[in-house]
Amino acid sequence: MTTTPISLTPGVLAEAVVDLGAIAHNVRLLRERAGSAQVMAVVKADGYGHGATAVARTALAAGAVELGVASVDEALTLRADGITAPVLAWLHAPGMDFGPALAADVQIAISSIRQLDEALDAARRTGTTATVTVKIDTGLNRNGVAPALYPEMVTRLRQAVAEDAIRLRGLMTHMVHADAPEKPINDIQSQRFKQMLDHARDQGVRFEVAHLSNSSATMARPDLTLDLVRPGIAVYGLSPVPRLGDMGLVPAMTVKCAVALVKSVSAGEGVSYGHTWIAPHDTNVALLPIGYADGVFRSLGGRLEVLINGKRRPGVGRVCMDQFLVDLGPGPLDVAEGDEAILFGPGTRGEPTAQDWADLVGTIHYEVVTSPRGRITRVYREAETVER
């Protein structure tokens, strides 16, 4: 897949351009890797910073059949925006009123007896059957029913189904190693999951679907695939296993801004707070009107590069709340105010990538793409990618 250049919208200070063609490509690829399993596209955290509703529509059109989010509020936002496909929400505060979720036909994932009781309370109050998935803990030791409590959960589920209080939709778990599909714990988790699934069946409790595969398992461990796969980061074109390359995925987000000012700096003069960078010779700098309040990590000061007019330009000095500077070098200027500066993108034009940023600051690309905010305007491009 190749990408076509994306121009900065006139009059916009900075923008995160989301290529919906890339999203569609990635979902189609995930469908291929999933084999006979269906795809639940995860659009939590506002679609990993890409916009949940736009991503959801694109993913569904490309072949995903369900959507996954963390909170009920995220699911209700999708419903308010006209999304009618099945949506599963799996992270809930104590005392959650599931009534609005049931009224909106949002599926609830429960991780404890208490959450089951809260879902049953909402079902009885509203006269609506709750569609429930049970999330079990197979080793992550985070959200999910603990193995020791699972037999009691199965008993309670059997009673609730007999009362027609719930529709028992699914059994799910989450992988420990999101970026290491070869780790033995993945197989241990799969074995535990299947044992717990068998226990429920032995007790007369049957789930419509079972699913544990995340992005990395979908792409690299087809033997773990069950009825559904739940890819998240791969939907957005970021490799779930960076050491294995792009895996055929296309990053969907490009962050860019306009050059706000170009000025000369004499040798020996410093720039930005604290003068952490002193010009070694007469040079020129460009001011970019975007800073750590917008998602450009302060720790990138003096470390990041941006692409302007086809050349990588090094950042100099500290990243400020609203702005930072890049060195254009001495001599004749080849950058003017208003020129486009690309902070990160797919990398196809030589610009840095989200993975480059992650490597610089010691984090993961998930954090990079979920960080753009503040004065960055999200813009969508419907067909910026072309199949090869």
Curated annotation (Swiss-Prot):
Record InterPro entries: Ala_racemase (IPR000821), Ala_racemase/Decarboxylase_C (IPR009006), Ala_racemase_C (IPR011079), Ala_racemase_N (IPR001608), Ala_racemase_pyridoxalP-BS (IPR020622), PLP-binding_barrel (IPR029066)
Pathway: Amino-acid biosynthesis; D-alanine biosynthesis; D-alanine from L-alanine: step 1/1
Cofactor requirements of the protein: pyridoxal 5'-phosphate
Pfam family, one: Ala_racemase_C
Reactions mediated catalytically: L-alanine = D-alanine
Residue positions where N6-(pyridoxal phosphate)lysine is found in the record: 44
GO MF annotation list: alanine racemase activity; pyridoxal phosphate binding
EC numbers, comma separated: 5.1.1.1
Keywords: Isomerase, Pyridoxal phosphate
Function comment: Catalyzes the interconversion of L-alanine and D-alanine. May also act on other amino acids.
Protein name as it appears in the record: Alanine racemase
Gene name per UniProt: alr
